[in-house]
Regions:
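Intrinsic-disorder/low-complexity detector
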Residues: 389, 400-401, 405-417
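Terminal, contiguous helix-loop blocks that mediate binding/assembly
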Residues: 1-394, 398, 418-419
Length: 419
């Protein structure tokens, strides 16, 4: 690498708008342009290159001029879609100051508070803006930097440090554009381990090689160890009430070990003990007495009269997001659906291939008239549940069986899909 840094470095790739990437590019680029989200299949709109032929504004460096052109072109190209998309421009001369305060804050979290912090991170996970692909039973492992810091504040409040970090973030992310999110992203993501990741230990070994903030890597190691800890919680029987609510009890002393719970609603299929999963819902009240209480929905979203399998991936105060496994024009995909006041019946945000290849990760489809959609269902085999048709308080939906749609569902889905 030459002593002189690049004027700018741009990543026409998915999920590169992270604080870890910023750390890697310190001293190597004056400006970094990257997306914190999955990029649609078309990637960049290269009309931004017109900035290279324009005269440089008197108050702007080349890296900044090109970066702003990239953000504007991305905005114009993807403004009409519904899929969440984002692009950020980082002024790298601001990174050292941001990292210094970030390191000091994370390093200063007392050891005696870390167990409580790990619990809070688990509880707040579904409330954080997350980025990347969503799979059944899993959580994206990239979250908004400022939302992670807000979660830390609930355990280790330091308003002065938080304000300094927010100001530093505003200088570091000098320009950005985002759409399709329930809130306003900060422009940068950060890695936060998920207990649903079967390759967590291997991923952490890789993460340690990035050289990112040593204080944060120590925190993620501790959080991962917490996630991997065997649960000793004994779950009681499920009780269904006439008002529709269901309850399950645990020992009061075990309440602090439960960071979150799901109500999972199943529908019986035939007489062989198989059940289709209809939805998961994290709106579960966890009482200090050890009682977990939830109420199933009265109705569930469907298309052409066929109910979808809705697996919750985000649950904010005024917004809930789900993924639904489907066959989209014959391809195994995940449909992303959001609910808010404006879209009480749900809005299909995007459809993405379920494959794990880099090619699949870059493809984002938008549901359009004429598409063929076949709902798919996760299947659970349960014995002796005739008197308890509703199961709940699960850590998440299992994804061992992605198919199982009824033949009539396939026939229904051959009709035109709704927008």
């Amino acid at each position: 690498m030459a002593d002189k840094e690049f004027d700018f470095v741009a990543f026409d790739a998915c999920l590169m708008g992270s604080v870890e990437i910023a750390d890697c590019m310190e001293g190597r680029a004056g400006y970094v342009i990257a997306s914190p989200e999955l990029e649609p299949q078309d990637g960049y709109d290269y009309s931004w290159m017109t900035a290279l032929g324009d005269s440089l504004p008197s108050d702007m460096e080349w890296g900044e001029a090109v970066g702003r052109s990239m953000v504007d072109a991305y905005d114009a190209y993807y403004a009409s879609g519904t899929a969440p998309v984002a692009m950020s421009l980082m002024d790298m001369k601001e990174y050292p100051a941001f990292h210094e305060v970030f390191h000091q804050y994370v390093d200063g979290i007392p050891q005696e508070l870390r167990e409580e912090l790990y619990r809070e991170l688990g509880k707040d996970r579904m409330k954080m803006l997350a980025f990347g692909s969503r799979q059944a039973g899993g959580s994206p492992e990239l979250v908004d930097v400022l939302e992670f810091l807000d979660a830390c504040q609930s355990v280790y409040p330091d308003e002065s440090a938080l304000q300094t970090l927010k100001e530093g973030m505003g200088k570091l992310v000098t320009d950005q554009w985002a759409k399709g999110y329930p809130g306003n992203p900060s422009g940068l993501t950060i890695y936060l381990p998920s207990g649903s990741n079967p390759y967590l230990s291997e991923d952490l070994e890789t993460y340690d090689t990035t050289g990112f903030c040593s204080a944060y890597r120590q925190l993620t190691d501790g959080y991962a160890a917490y996630l991997a800890r065997e649960s000793g919680v004994e779950w009681g029987n499920i009780n269904a009430h006439k008002d529709g609510t269901v309850e399950i009890s645990i020992a009061p002393e075990d309440v602090s070990d439960v960071t979150g719970a799901y109500l999972a609603v199943f529908c019986p299929v035939g007489d062989d003990g198989n059940y289709y999963l209809l939805c998961t819902d994290s709106d579960v009240d966890i009482g200090v007495d050890g009682t977990l209480r939830a109420a199933p929905e009265n109705s569930y979203m469907g298309m052409k009269g066929q109910v979808l399998c809705l697996i919750e991936t985000m649950n904010l105060d005024a917004y809930t997001e789900y993924m639904a496994p489907v066959l989209y024009n014959g391809e195994l995909c995940t449909m992303r659906i959001g609910f808010d006041e404006e879209h009480e019946d749900g809005q299909v945000l995007s459809v993405t291939p379920a494959g794990q290849t880099s090619e699949a990760a870059k493809q984002i489809y938008e549901l359009k008239e004429g598409d063929r959609v076949t709902p798919l269902y996760l299947v659970e085999h349960m014995e002796d549940v005739e008197e308890e048709p509703v199961d709940g308080a699960k850590d998440g939906a299992k994804d061992e069986a992605k198919d199982g749609a009824k033949d009539e569902a396939k026939d229904e889905a051959k009709n035109e899909a709704k927008d």
